[in-house]
Design a protein with these regions (language model features):
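Multi-pass alpha-helical transporter architecture, strongest
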Residues: 158-175
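Intracellular juxtamembrane helix-capping segments at the cytosolic ends
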Residues: 102-117
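Helix-to-loop junctions at the C-terminal end of transmembrane segments
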Residues: 50-63, 145-146
Length: 175
């Protein structure tokens, strides 16, 4: 269940950032909708690059340690993203969060399959069901944003990142 929630939360982070980065850019920098939409492209470009770089790094670094470092950097970067107002810093932090979150799905999925290899079909199906995280987290973000503001909605993603950071240490203990 812990890993299922991890998949749910990492997908929720991806979808949540995809929908809110443009709003964040418009609110903090005064960008137009068409300009701010490029923020999502920046995030997913960083994720793509991070996936390729991660493939090489994961061949040399233990995946639990890699995830711990990634989540630590992602959490710090995301907290800074909530408080900075500069277009340059927002852009840099969007890239940092994209790079550091890029390999989390595959690490969690791999650990889940290794946990009970004799039940890999069931485990795989459960993990893929976690992809619904984008459909669950984003509406909750919307409710929080409407009630308390943009930063409150984004704070839900911070809670997701904190959970992922916590499970990165739990994965190390399972070995």
């Amino acid at each position: 269940m812990m890993l299922f929630l991890g998949i749910l939360f990492i997908v929720g982070i991806d979808v949540g950032l995809n929908t809110t980065i443009p709003k964040l850019l418009m609110a903090k920098t005064g960008m137009s909708v068409s300009e701010a939409g490029l923020g999502s492209s920046l995030y997913f470009s960083a994720r793509t690059i991070g996936s390729f770089v991660g493939a090489f790094l994961l061949a040399r670094i233990a995946s639990d340690r890699f995830m711990q470092y990634s989540m630590g950097i992602a959490i710090v970067g995301f907290i800074l993203l909530l408080v900075v107002d500069s277009l340059l810093w927002i852009s840099i932090l969007v890239v940092v969060v994209g790079l550091t979150c890029s390999n989390v799905f595959s690490i969690i999925f791999s650990y889940a399959l290794q946990h009970l290899p004799e039940r890999d079909n069931e485990i795989s199906a459960l993990m893929i069901m976690g992809v619904s995280g984008g459909a669950l987290i984003t509406p909750l973000m919307g409710v929080l944003s409407d009630a308390l503001g943009q930063v409150a909605g984004l704070s839900l993603l911070l809670l997701c990142l904190l959970y992922l950071g916590w499970i990165s240490f739990r994965l190390q203990k399972r070995k």
